[in-house]
Amino acid sequence: MIKIAITKGRIQKQVTKLLENADYDVEPILNLGRELQIKTKDDLQIIFGKPNDVITFLEHGIVDIGFVGKDTLDENDFDDYYELLYLKIGQCIFALASYPDFSNKNFQRHKRIASKYPRVTKKYFAQKQEDIEIIKLEGSVELGPVVGLADAIVDIVETGNTLSANGLEVIEKISDISTRMIVNKSSFKFKKDKIIEMVERLEDAQTN
């Protein structure tokens, strides 16, 4: 049996479609009620959770495989996993965004950067050898520059429509984001053949 955790919401819907295209039994997922975990005819046991919970399940060996966004992986310090598959799901970017004149400003203090992703933000500016003040926001991060709380933001950008609607723009792309299929290293050691078979089936389903 392979135990899997899938991020709830859009990723769940898109991964379900991918599993279906790979000829896996998705009937229990499509008919999901209040069950906390389900089993399929393919000997898969699946649970659904919030992004950080998927990481926690994997970290503690509760599941073998996780489907989770690269943004969540980058923001966590868990690294005891292998990244098996780059899925064409939830594609977007991490970006530094601000007003158009941001790059030309001479700051007499540390730049204030608003973000839901302090770890990603800290790493990005550390690579640029810049000391900054990180302001953690949980809601609309774009409000940071708009209300004068921050000079710029680090956030996920998909279409850029929200940025442009508020007079902001992408200053620099940080990295590409998409859903990733990851496996606990210990699980891969003991269930390698079954896991590789699953990866190959999903790869074929992505390209067909």
UniProtKB/Swiss-Prot annotation:
Cellular compartment(s): Cytoplasm
Top-level taxon: Bacteria
A single MF term (Gene Ontology): ATP binding
GO biological process, alphabetically ordered: L-histidine biosynthetic process
Catalysis performed (reactions): 1-(5-phospho-beta-D-ribosyl)-ATP + diphosphate = 5-phospho-alpha-D-ribose 1-diphosphate + ATP
EC numbers for this chain: 2.4.2.17
Keywords: Amino-acid biosynthesis, ATP-binding, Cytoplasm, Glycosyltransferase, Histidine biosynthesis, Nucleotide-binding, Transferase
Regions crossing the membrane: none
Pathway assigned to this chain's UniProt record: Amino-acid biosynthesis; L-histidine biosynthesis; L-histidine from 5-phospho-alpha-D-ribose 1-diphosphate: step 1/9
Gene3D superfamilies in the record: Periplasmic binding protein-like II
Enzyme class, first EC level, given as a word: transferase
Any one Gene Ontology cellular component term annotated for this protein: cytoplasm
Sections of the chain in a coiled coil: none
PANTHER family recorded: ATP PHOSPHORIBOSYLTRANSFERASE, ATP PHOSPHORIBOSYLTRANSFERASE ATP-PRTASE
Family membership noted in the UniProt record: Belongs to the ATP phosphoribosyltransferase family. Short subfamily.
Domain statement: Lacks the C-terminal regulatory region which is replaced by HisZ.
Miscellaneous remark of the record: The stability and homogeneity of the HisG-HisZ complex is apparently increased by ATP and 5-phosphoribose 1-diphosphate but decreased in the presence of the regulatory inhibitor histidine.
Function: Catalyzes the condensation of ATP and 5-phosphoribose 1-diphosphate to form N'-(5'-phosphoribosyl)-ATP (PR-ATP). Has a crucial role in the pathway because the rate of histidine biosynthesis seems to be controlled primarily by regulation of HisG enzymatic activity.
Quaternary structure note: Heterooctamer composed of four HisG and four HisZ subunits.
Protein name in UniProt: ATP phosphoribosyltransferase
UniProt source species: Lactococcus lactis subsp. lactis (strain IL1403)
